[in-house]
């Protein structure tokens, strides 16, 4: 897969001036438990190992703890973090609906460890989901037979890949998935899927031959003077509004590394290999190049497992605004889907 600035936009799409390189909320990356309106603790801090780094996050537990709970594994989209950038609001909704949630920051981002800081690698992040599952099944409150993976934008593509590899996954939720702007080629002999599976399960993904795009701003209001990875004005507005909030640990800078892949590889080739039902929540008016709804629909048609499609308005970032009617529509559809396949 040729790594270019356009590819970054393609893989990322995001889920998420002074000195743009310094813009962000850079407080001490420390998380604390938090209680709901009734005084019940909503989550506890957790950590687990992945690719020689410690990843950190929150384990949300429902109020009814009389039995083991189904769990949703959540990681945010491109460069975004778990505190204050809307994924935490989705986690709270799932907890209210009776699900446990493990929400964590990807390697190199937020409160998780890993170097180089703010470097994004699709394969390393995908492996993080699998290592997270390894961890969560050891928790006494969790029903290890009822696990869902969740992703938005770039991480939707990661959850999709993981759902084609890990037999423990029983449901897959993808919001505004970033399946790139090109249609997947046919994987006649299954070798492209086999490559992806082998790559994700490698013990040292970063030790594989790879290329790196150096740090640059994620968003910018001045594409001539300070060009950025994401050029859409909606991306700029969302990232600055949500990432700039106190305590997010988000910074407006990113580098991107990618392993060498076969020329025709495309994550959509994993569709026939999914191990579980999938929900796709798709913005039919998505403005991001790498979240082309037509490409997503072609991949949807390739899925052999039970599948559901939900159209949503608001472009790529509409359902990431909280509170909003689009957030409510999205979370309701997800809870209905998860109740069907995890309860």
Roles of regions detected by a PLM:
Residues 274, 280-282:
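Short beta-strand/loop motif that positions the catalytic acidic residue
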């Amino acid at each position: 897969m040729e790594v270019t600035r356009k590819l970054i936009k393609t893989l990322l799409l995001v889920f998420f001036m002074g000195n743009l390189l310094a813009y962000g909320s850079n407080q001490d990356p420390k998380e604390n438990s938090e209680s709901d309106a009734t005084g019940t603790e909503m989550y506890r801090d957790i950590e687990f190992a992945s690719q020689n780094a410690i990843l950190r996050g929150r384990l949300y537990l429902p109020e009814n703890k009389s039995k083991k709970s189904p769990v949703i594994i959540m990681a945010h989209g491109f460069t975004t973090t778990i505190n204050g950038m809307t994924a935490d609001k989705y986690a709270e909704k799932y907890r209210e609906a009776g699900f446990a949630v493990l929400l964590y920051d990807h390697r190199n981002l937020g409160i998780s460890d890993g170097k180089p800081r703010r470097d994004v690698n699709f394969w390393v992040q995908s492996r993080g989901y699998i290592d997270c599952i390894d961890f969560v099944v050891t928790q006494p409150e969790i029903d290890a037979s009822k696990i869902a993976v969740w992703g938005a934008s770039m991480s939707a593509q990661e959850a999709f890949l993981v759902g084609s590899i890990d037999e423990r996954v029983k449901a897959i939720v993808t919001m505004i998935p970033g399946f790139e702007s090109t249609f997947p080629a046919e994987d006649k002999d299954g070798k492209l899927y086999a490559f992806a599976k082998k790559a994700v399960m490698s013990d040292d993904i970063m030790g594989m031959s790879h290329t790196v795009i150096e740090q640059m701003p994620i968003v910018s209001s001045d594409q001539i003077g300070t060009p950025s990875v994401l050029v859409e004005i909606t991306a700029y507005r969302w990232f600055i509004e949500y990432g700039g909030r106190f305590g997010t640990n988000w910074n407006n800078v990113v580098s991107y590394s990618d392993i060498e892949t076969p020329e025709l590889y495309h994550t959509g080739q994993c569709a026939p290999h999914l191990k579980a039902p999938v929900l796709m929540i798709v913005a039919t008016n998505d403005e991001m190049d790498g979240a082309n709804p037509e490409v997503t629909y072609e991949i949807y048609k390739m899925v052999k497992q039970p599948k559901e499609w939900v159209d949503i308005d608001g472009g790529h970032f509409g359902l990431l605004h909280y509170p909003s009617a689009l957030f409510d529509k999205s979370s309701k559809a997800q809870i209905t889907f998860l109740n069907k396949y995890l309860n």
